[in-house]
């Protein structure tokens, strides 16, 4: 089971996605209400636009009273040249994975799949903000980042399930590989000619 968060589209049963509620169904969370809420910010920190987006998301979350959380490696990369850093907690060190409410993924489909791998045995929903070339799994674009974070701050999302599958490859009666996949898996020839 993989739990993912999403803003707009309908999702198949299996993994959870959060959907932003339509206008008119919002409730406003005050800063004191947000205290204690922990949001995982997962970014493709090898790309400048993802580092900038992560800094922006962390600052916006912190300003609203939420606790931004990142992996140690992402935070170390992000901390370089951060003009106005905000306090960010480290998952598995100062914050347990089970205490995270939601993960926001800043990158393309590859980043979303890596984040899904991290949280797949939990009930943490993920919401993807597309910064990559392929964004089939993301629910919003980089230009919508502030609005997406505002929806997270105000708890303006619902969680839906998405299908995750276990994959096994067998050869001559022996299992040679097993893994999991989100939506689909494919088998290709070893030699592509």
What is each model feature region?
Residues 66-73:
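Short internal beta-strands
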Residues 87-100:
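Short acidic low-complexity segments
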Residues 45-46, 109-111, 134:
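Short glycine-rich anion-binding loops that position phosphate/pyrophosphate groups of nucleotides
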Residues 136-193:
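Catalytic core of DAGKc-family lipid kinases
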Residues 122-140:
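Short, acidic/small-residue loops that bind anionic groups at enzyme active sites
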Residues 17-45:
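Generic N-terminal amphipathic, Lys/Arg-enriched alpha-helix
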Residues 50-51, 110-116:
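Short glycine/serine/threonine-rich phosphate/pyrophosphate-binding segments
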Residues 1-11:
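Short beta-strand segments of a lipoyl-like beta-sandwich/carrier module
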